[in-house]
């Protein structure tokens, strides 16, 4: 089904920190940030309620810090703080486009963000505000992908949209294998069994338990967010039933 009427009433968009890099080696590319804000605003103006979970890998990755000998918990907390920086930057970009936005942090820092309160987040969305969830789950050892699955379920989102650099889920790395099979649809069980690295196993398992549909798509192709919301076949859909390829 496709058309000009959204098929989703409420979505959760997962953005990696790396998505904000653009052509930069570190930090945030302001032109990329503005493009994301423009696309999200366009969807929001269609009456779709939007929540966002953002990573921090463009600034600091907890796993990378731990691999260099840092205590894993400390490294993960540093990564969570990086997500707050990204969330504030995205909030600023969205509000420049006239979109009222709130940041909720799983780590208390009342000077810059609201604490994460589920009912308040729901109320914000009902009032037409975008909500950005920062600081992951607030706990070490959990990825922002797992946070995205958790928040999507808590918010009652109808779909979790996972933004990536490629146009879906492949059987192998398309950069190393240009003829790699791309899935149009795949089940949660298949993703886990085939150990496909689109999201970590905890995130996929959580989505599977609650039958939270995931759409994996290429953020770099302008207009993809809107196309998915309108029901067009973009990227790879991950859902409950097994699909023959």
UniProtKB/Swiss-Prot annotation:
Q: Name one GO cellular component term.
A: cytoplasm
Classification via Gene3D superfamilies: Acetylglutamate kinase-like
Protein localization: Cytoplasm
- Which InterPro entries does the protein's record reference? AceGlu_kinase-like_sf (IPR036393), Asp/Glu/Uridylate_kinase (IPR001048), Uridylate_kinase (IPR011817), Uridylate_kinase_bac (IPR015963)
Kindly indicate where the leader peptide sits in this chain. none
Enumerate the residues binding ATP: 14-17, 57, 61, 164, 170, 173
The UniProt entry's GO biological process terms, in alphabetical order, are: 'de novo' CTP biosynthetic process; UDP biosynthetic process
Q: What class of enzyme is it?
A: transferase
Single GO molecular function: ATP binding
Could you list this entry's UniProt keywords, alphabetically sorted: ATP-binding, Cytoplasm, Kinase, Nucleotide-binding, Pyrimidine biosynthesis, Transferase
For this chain, the family text in UniProt reads: Belongs to the UMP kinase family.
The record's section on PANTHER family has: URIDYLATE KINASE (PTHR42833), URIDYLATE KINASE PUMPKIN, CHLOROPLASTIC (PTHR42833:SF4)
Q: Give the protein's function.
A: Catalyzes the reversible phosphorylation of UMP to UDP.
Q: Which NCBIfam families does the annotation name?
A: pyrH_bact (TIGR02075)
Q: How does it assemble?
A: Homohexamer.
Query: Can you name this protein?
Result: Uridylate kinase
The protein's organism comes out as Syntrophobacter fumaroxidans (strain DSM 10017 / MPOB)
């Amino acid at each position: 089904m496709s058309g000009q009427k959204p098929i989703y009433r409420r979505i959760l968009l997962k953005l990696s920190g790396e998505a904000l890099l653009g052509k930069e080696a570190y930090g945030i590319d302001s032109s990329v940030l503005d493009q994301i804000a423009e696309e999200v605003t366009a969807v929001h103006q269609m009456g779709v309620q939007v929540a966002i979970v953002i990573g921090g890998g463009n600034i600091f990755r907890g796993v990378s810090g731990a691999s260099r000998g840092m205590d894993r918990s400390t490294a993960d907390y540093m990564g969570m703080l990086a997500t707050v920086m990204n969330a504030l930057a995205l909030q600023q970009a969205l509000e420049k486009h006239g979109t009222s936005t709130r940041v909720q942090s799983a780590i208390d820092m009342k000077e810059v963000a609201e604490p994460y309160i589920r009912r308040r987040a729901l109320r914000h969305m009902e009032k037409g505000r975008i909500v950005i969830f920062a600081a992951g789950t607030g706990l070490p050892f959990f990825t922002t992908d797992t946070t995205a699955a958790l928040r999507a379920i808590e918010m009652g989102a109808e779909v979790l949209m996972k933004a990536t650099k490629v146009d879906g889920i492949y059987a192998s790395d398309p950069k190393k294998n240009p003829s790699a099979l791309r899935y149009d649809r795949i089940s949660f069980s298949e993703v886990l069994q085939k150990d496909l690295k689109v999201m970590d196993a905890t995130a996929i398992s959580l989505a599977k338990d609650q039958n939270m549909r995931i759409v994996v798509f290429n953020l770099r192709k302008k207009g993809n967010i809107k196309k998915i919301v309108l029901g067009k076949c973009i990227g790879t859909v991950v859902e409950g039933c097994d699909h023959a390829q």
